[in-house]
Amino acid sequence: LLNTLTEAVGKPVTEIHTKDLYAGNSPFRQLTPEQRSNLIGQIFQWLRDRKHSVVFTAVDKGNFLANRDNEAFHADLGTLWRHMAFHITLALQKHGQTFEKNKGNTVLIFDNKVNDQRNFTKLLLNPPTWSDTYYAKKKKQEQLDQIVDVPHFVDSKEVALIQLADFLCYFLRKHLELSLGLAAPKFDGEVDVMNGYATNTLKLASPKAHIFLNRGRCPASDYFYRYAPTTIR
């Protein structure tokens, strides 16, 4: 992918900066909107060809900040980042245990997050018991048994898949901002463009019931559901 981008712009591209690619900022300034759209399409196709799947989450930040202090579960998580990272962890656990002999095959790799790394690691080593119901933990089952030990934190410049996660997050976030009226479209048709990119992203996602369960929610799944934007859950 980086080679494809390098060939397109005629100079080395060492990191996928999706905002710059989409908007036509340097180093993509000389490319036409159609050329940039084609490159974005190639990245989505690359993900599809390799059968990558996605687990995502989203939070209505205003709702979350206004109510977090009244949430008993929030005391165990502590920050918005940990709220989202733990939700992803639980969704991966729920998804992973649907496969046979898959125990301990999931490694969590995050972009560097200095302020949260230590506490999040402690959280995963000793998960709160309220989270067990999210994935219907069995009596003799170990907590988060799909997850390998502790999370890893890396510099996204050195890990291309982190950059691709950012790529997908960019379009999903822009879609949510436009659909909720939190941002205005910058050109005619941008809402439709973002709807298309969001659809491509969601087609890669694991079953929605592993992330935002529409009914029959336990308190843990309801906690994450209630703070998700209405247009994504």
Kindly give the residue locations of the regions a language model identified.
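Phosphate-ester processing/binding pockets and catalytic centers
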Residues: L1-R233
